[in-house]
């Protein structure tokens, strides 16, 4: 973690009482801003807070919502990987295998190294995905995080995040990028490399392994060469 950083949770002290989206204010538990290393090379962007994130304030955190792994009002397929793995086995497990998350750290306060986690939107409605207007309302938060962190690699997690990030940071039209084909590949963007990821809750074991292998290969390269190495 950056030597001058005091906290991993909402390190830029963004508005934790934001009311830009009235409908989401009625359904959220917590305003979920970014979490992690402000000197990170790798910035992960999801669509919206998970159920666990809404509870803890930490993006991508998730817990089993019940005996079948679901949360109220959502389809079982949204909370289990194919084959029955729960969503709590998702992104964190991948980061642990890459050496980017301390395996002994608490589920709701992961100790991340060189990683920052955030979302397109900061609040959750458990019954629906965010609207385009809600994503636009939250865009200044995301833009500020990307600008202040200045990562080397953006990892859009899921179809919606890929479309938004590709539109903003690449010259490739979003309609030309299908997540199934872009998963576990590197896309050169404007100032950033993109490595798209299917939501870990929806990945097959083969897709998870493919993404891990591709990202490990990327980490072994001089991926910082376009911006120069920064002191951490």
Task: Label the model's feature ranges.
Residues 2-232:
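A polyanion-binding, active-site-adjacent surface
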């Amino acid at each position: 973690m950056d030597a001058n950083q005091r906290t991993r949770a909402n390190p830029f002290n963004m508005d934790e009482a934001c009311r830009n989206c009235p409908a989401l204010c009625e359904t959220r538990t917590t305003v979920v801003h970014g979490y992690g290393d402000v000197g990170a090379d790798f910035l992960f962007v999801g669509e919206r807070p998970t159920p666990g994130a809404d509870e803890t304030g930490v993006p991508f955190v998730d817990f089993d919502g019940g005996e079948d792994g679901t949360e109220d009002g959502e389809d079982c397929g949204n909370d289990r990987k194919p084959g029955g793995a729960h969503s709590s086995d998702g992104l964190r497990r991948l980061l642990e295998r890459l050496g980017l998350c301390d395996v002994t750290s608490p589920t709701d306060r992961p100790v991340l190294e060189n990683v920052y986690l955030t979302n397109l939107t900061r609040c959750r409605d458990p019954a629906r995905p965010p609207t385009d207007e809600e994503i636009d309302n939250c865009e200044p938060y995301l833009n500020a995080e990307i600008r202040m962190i200045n990562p080397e690699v953006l990892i859009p997690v899921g179809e919606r995040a890929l479309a938004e990030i590709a539109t903003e940071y690449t010259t490739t039209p979003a309609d030309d990028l299908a997540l199934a084909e872009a998963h576990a590949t590197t896309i050169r963007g404007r100032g950033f490399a993109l490595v798209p990821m299917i939501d870990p809750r929806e990945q097959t074991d083969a897709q998870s392994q493919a993404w891990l292998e591709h990202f490990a290969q990327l980490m072994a390269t001089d991926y910082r060469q376009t911006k120069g190495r920064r002191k951490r």
